[in-house]
């Protein structure tokens, strides 16, 4: 058994936990290897680029917040990922710092359970081939620095859904429904729901609302504008700039993310404690 370890190197507490984890793994006779930048900060010679880490380990440990987990998941392929929260919100990271050793031990013993999460795949035709990008949370196309309001034309399975005049469009998974989409007015969707949500950003129409669709639908998006460049972001990372009328196709990826589940963690409780769901002002609930 060998673990691939990814650290949010900007957090000193994450580095401290990584050192404790290494000592514990060595005492157990368990192998490990760090992502390159993490290895540099921790002072370890055992490292590999994040793109190669999944070929050299059996499972991943993410030490950081939700952003670190998203980064790790993009490269984990089908390997299980243990998310240890050393961040601010920790909505996706299943385990607290105090639960780290117990969680890792369950993976070593093979007594863990998995939460399987759907990913989005965004593809853009370029130079005779398709550029493809994956996202666990969301794919976002924005107007960027374009000074006017462009129209985002959306088709579902080749049929026109609508043309949205807005600052951008968010395509989110059920996992990503509590991220950018929620901030833009989208609904909260239970994690195992087989749906996507299309959420416009600041639409210039009172009648426009987010729409929930089957995750079997193929979504095509293009930006109608006379000029300009429009950012295509996947899980908060800029992937490329789009030209007017350049088509982006978004669909369910065949690659799933396997997150090691915390059996003591209830999704409804997470909504209440992390997002203060349903909490009244001055309520003790």
Swiss-Prot record:
The entry's keywords: ATP-binding, Cytoplasm, Kinase, NAD, NADP, Nucleotide-binding, Transferase
Cellular component GO terms, alphabetical: cytoplasm
Documented EC number(s): 2.7.1.23
Catalyses which reaction(s): NAD(+) + ATP = ADP + NADP(+) + H(+)
Principal location class: cytoplasm
InterPro entries: ATP-NAD_kinase_N (IPR017438), ATP-NAD_kinase_PpnK-typ_C (IPR017437), NAD/diacylglycerol_kinase_sf (IPR016064), NADK (IPR002504)
GO BP term, pick one: NADP biosynthetic process
Cofactors, names only: a divalent metal cation
Binding residues for NAD(+): 66-67, 137-138, 148, 165, 167, 178-183
EC category: transferase
Top-level taxon of the source organism: Bacteria
Residues annotated as the enzyme's active site: 66 (proton acceptor)
Keyword Amino-acid biosynthesis: no
Keyword Magnesium: no
Cellular localization per UniProt: Cytoplasm
Molecular function terms, GO-annotated: ATP binding; metal ion binding; NAD binding; NAD+ kinase activity
Function: Involved in the regulation of the intracellular balance of NAD and NADP, and is a key enzyme in the biosynthesis of NADP. Catalyzes specifically the phosphorylation on 2'-hydroxyl of the adenosine moiety of NAD to yield NADP.
Family: Belongs to the NAD kinase family.
Protein name: NAD kinase
Organism annotation: Chlorobium luteolum (strain DSM 273 / BCRC 81028 / 2530)
